[in-house]
From Swiss-Prot:
Disulfide-linked positions: none
Biological function: Produces ATP from ADP in the presence of a proton gradient across the membrane.
Pfam families per record: ATP-synt_DE (PF00401), ATP-synt_DE_N (PF02823)
Name this protein carries in UniProt: ATP synthase epsilon chain
Summary of subunit composition and partner proteins: F-type ATPases have 2 components, CF(1) - the catalytic core - and CF(0) - the membrane proton channel. CF(1) has five subunits: alpha(3), beta(3), gamma(1), delta(1), epsilon(1). CF(0) has three main subunits: a, b and c.
Entry's Gene Ontology BP terms: proton motive force-driven ATP synthesis
Origin: domain of life: Bacteria
Topology in the lipid bilayer: Peripheral membrane protein
Species whose genome carries this gene: Coxiella burnetii (strain RSA 493 / Nine Mile phase I)
Length: 142
């Protein structure tokens, strides 16, 4: 039996996931992080991206988050996300539309607050699409 740790994923709206996992992969401020049971304590920011959790027994679950914070303690990992959704709940058409709209706005703006907002929206839409793609790859494996 593989070692596990408790994972809690919480957004401003609701608790998204609570359970035992064998491994977690998230997008940190400095790149991807792989967290296994026994990982050293850590507190870091998270960028928009996906959360991949390998559940007890090896099943994979994918989530989307718009950014937030990650806290790793000896027995528990907590992800406090601005927004978090299970990848199966994402709307691919809406994500593609949001990405295209953000790209159009970026083409018009060269600097300023609107440019920064469009960049953030583009990153979030791209992260949603990556989470959907990751979910599809996972489904093909099983």
């Amino acid at each position: 039996m593989a070692k596990t740790m408790q994972l809690e994923i919480v957004s401003a709206e609701a608790a998204i996931f609570s359970g035992k996992v064998e491994m977690i992969v998230v997008t940190g401020g400095m790149g991807e992080l792989g967290i296994y049971p026994g990982h050293r304590q850590l507190l870091t920011s998270l960028k928009p991206g996906q959360i991949k959790a390998i559940l007890e027994g090896g099943k994979e679950e994918v989530f989307y988050m718009s950014g937030g914070m990650l806290e790793v303690q000896p027995e528990i990992v907590t992800i406090l996300a601005d927004t978090a959704l299970r990848a199966v709940d994402l709307d691919e058409a809406a994500a593609i539309s949001a990405k295209e709209e953000a790209e159009r706005r970026l083409a018009k703006q060269k600097a300023g607050i609107e440019y920064s907002k469009a960049m953030t929206e583009l990153a979030e839409a791209a992260a949603q699409l990556r989470a959907i793609q990751m979910l599809r790859k996972s489904a093909k494996k099983h």
